[in-house]
Each structure stands twice: as C-alpha cells, then as structure tokens.
Design a protein with these regions (language model features):
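Conserved N-terminal phosphate-binding loop of PLP-dependent enzymes in the Aspartate aminotransferase
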Residues: 1-151
Length: 151
C-alpha cells in the first residue's frame, strides 16, 4: 500500500519538470486504500498537532540526553537534534555499535547513519508517551554503564 508526496518551492518544481515531467510520476499511484490511509494520517497529524508534540518531547528528551552525555565523556562527542529527530555522536563507530547493540538488547531501536555507527539516530514515533521516553532514557543509561566497562 505505497504512497508518497513531494513538496517543494516553485523554483525546484520548475527544475523537476525539465526536460520530461513524466519522469516524476508514479507506477503505484491512485490506490484507494493507500489514499484513504494518507488522508486519515494527514487529518490525525493536523488534529493532534503532532509537530507541537514532537517539539515539546524533543525539548524534554534532548537535555536529558545531554546530561547522560556529560556523564560519559569517554563515549560521547555530542548530542544534536531537533524535536524527536535526535543524533547521538560517538568518538568512534565501534562505541556507537556497542551502544546500539545494547539498546537493541533492551528493546530500543535506533538507526545508524550511512554505513557506520559513529552517529546513531533516535527517531521515536511522534505519538510516543513521555513514560516510554523515560524508559528509553533508563535503558540508555544502563547501556552506557555497560559499554563504559568495555572501554
């Protein structure tokens, strides 16, 4: 049930239309179920103001991650991010792999960037409750203590 959208400025759109605008069409478009799901998702996003939730939850989460990073300077370079798109930067990919593996073991999914774990991403769903954010932080704290012992 694939669906996608493309938004751009007029300037970018004009470039995309050259030389053949049909290059940027879809082979899976027009599916009624996918379109209905997309409309429902847009309505939910607007009704629940998910962008505001993401901003507030990021303001809650990022300072707590920065505190953890300060407690483990031998592990972290820095924390960056905005809203619920958060990056944890490590001194080297091996440490990032250990942190990611420890989180996976504890049921927390994170993502590497490109082909290594020098930086790993925390990207929870926008509707995640604060209680689960706290669980992520607790599990990260346990993971960091475990990883520190291996350094």
């Amino acid at each position: 049930m694939p669906i996608s959208a493309f938004c751009s400025t007029e300037e970018i759109w004009q470039v995309m239309m050259q030389p053949n605008p049909f290059i940027h069409t879809t082979t899976t478009g027009g599916g009624a179920l996918a379109c209905s799901a997309a409309i429902a998702a847009i309505r939910f996003t607007l009704r629940e103001k998910l962008w505001e939730q993401a901003a507030a939850k990021g303001e809650y989460m990022i300072p707590k991650l920065e505190t953890l990073a300060a407690q483990y300077p031998e592990i972290y370079e820095r924390i960056t991010g905005r809203g619920l798109l958060i990056w944890m930067h490590f001194h080297n990919p091996e440490v990032g792999y250990k942190v990611a593996a420890g989180l996976f073991k504890r049921g927390v999914l994170v993502g590497g960037t490109l082909t290594n774990a020098h930086t790993i991403r925390i990207e929870p769903p926008l509707v995640i409750p604060y209680e689960l954010l706290d669980k992520v932080l607790d599990r990260l704290s346990d993971t960091l203590a475990e990883v520190k012992k291996t350094l």
